[in-house]
Amino acid sequence: MAKFDAHLKCSFCAKSQDQVRKLIAGPGVYICDECIDLCNEILDEELIDTQAKLNNSTQVKKKLPINNPDTSIPFELTSIPKPLEIKTFLDNQVVGQESAKKILSVAVYNHYKRLTWRLKEENKDNNSNDCHATKLQKSNILLIGPTGSGKTLLAQTLAEFLDVPFAVADATTLTEAGYVGEDVENILLRLLQKSEMNVDLAQKGIIYIDEIDKIARKSENPSITRDVSGEGVQQALLKMLEGTIANVPPQGGRKHPYHDCIQIDTSQILFICGGAFIGLEDIVQKRLGRHSIGFTTNSDESKIDAKKLVDSRDALKNLELDDLVKYGLIPEFIGRIPVCAVLDRLTKETLESILTEPRDALVKQFKTLLSMDNVELNFEPESVEAIANEAFKRKTGARALRSIIEELMLDLMYTLPSQEEVTKFTITKKMVDNLFSSKIVKLPAGSHRIIKESA
């Protein structure tokens, strides 16, 4: 056996076992320590070249230089819109949700005031530094509301108005480090890509984490099993929400010890978390004494304070932090999102307004589409009401409106481009009630379009 070992050679350089310090065996192959060192040198050179190309990239140079304090912040304090101005802009884009819009306006205004305050403190002369200067901490925001109530739209509208980098992340794809799925640092990579890889600009942006309720702890007992997509993700997000220097892989994916990472300071990034939190109303009502377990008697019902009884749609207005803990969010996570805005469930009247009032309302969108075919589209007020009623029945919020109108307009959008003699079209309530079973009657050129509605 010893004679056989003496003839072992490196499969790469062909040196025998006696000529090298170490010979590592694999499945049918061998490699010596010298070849391993050579491979490491090759990998290091490749990493250096990659980093040099990244630093010289035109995308990085397109934005403002990082080392210039006068231009590193997108705007000065004097140009930041006041909360009333922010809410006015939100009113033009989002219908309803007055309380949530007011909370967002104040929170965003204070956030950028804090950024400007920090910039002024950093630019002070070293001789005049005040060790007792007040440090302003950021306040992340939690949006709670049913699906289709406008959580994502509010965040996107804010980013559009403030003209800062804005990224949307999905919490359902995140897992704890070491498991299949995305690391939490990939959220910052999306913000970097929106900033064209400008770190300084990304550090002043906004990140909206959607479906945050899906990372709630699966059980109230944290010791039952390891929850890598629930509590584990909450633990991983703690430092990022509070403010830390995060290492982000420039190509995404998992971090590798031999790959260079981009460092981002998250203390200046505003995080907005949103979720539907289905079932949270029941937790609030149970705390208020609305529900009881098992059979009840008249004497039991008399013990319930009638003043505390609330409708299920208004239960979230009485939300407390303990309710979120019972839902599955850990206290440390809740403590890093101090601002909480509860969005109202959309009513039929609100859905009608959403169809017609905003700048990008669905009715205006389809009117614009048909105007490109030289057709004037009109909606009867009763038809708008019928569409809103159908959307309210589907219980998916404003998202149901587009689905209904797309279904309503499908046949019309298919036939109208080929009928050049028709110049006007009106959507009626009967068309909606009859599930869009309308027929178009052709008329002589130059006449208006008439809708023949089947019974």
UniProtKB/Swiss-Prot annotation:
GO CC terms, sorted: HslUV protease complex
A GO BP entry: cell division
Signal peptide: none
Segments forming domain ClpX-type ZB: 1-51
SUPFAM superfamilies, per database record: Glucocorticoid receptor-like (DNA-binding domain), P-loop containing nucleoside triphosphate hydrolases
Domain of life: Bacteria
Binding site for ATP: 146-153
UniProt-annotated binding residues for Zn(2+): 10, 13, 32, 35
Keyword ATP-binding: yes
Keywords: ATP-binding, Chaperone, Metal-binding, Nucleotide-binding, Zinc
PROSITE patterns, A to Z: CLPX_ZB
GO molecular function per UniProt: ATP binding; ATP hydrolysis activity; ATP-dependent protein folding chaperone; protein dimerization activity; unfolded protein binding; zinc ion binding
Record-linked Pfam families: AAA_2, ClpB_D2-small, zf-C4_ClpX
Family that this chain belongs to: Belongs to the ClpX chaperone family.
Subunit structure: Component of the ClpX-ClpP complex. Forms a hexameric ring that, in the presence of ATP, binds to fourteen ClpP subunits assembled into a disk-like structure with a central cavity, resembling the structure of eukaryotic proteasomes.
NCBIfam families in the record: clpX (TIGR00382), PRK05342.1 (NF003745)
Function: ATP-dependent specificity component of the Clp protease. It directs the protease to specific substrates. Can perform chaperone functions in the absence of ClpP.
The protein's name in its UniProt record: ATP-dependent Clp protease ATP-binding subunit ClpX
Source organism of the structure: Prochlorococcus marinus (strain MIT 9515)
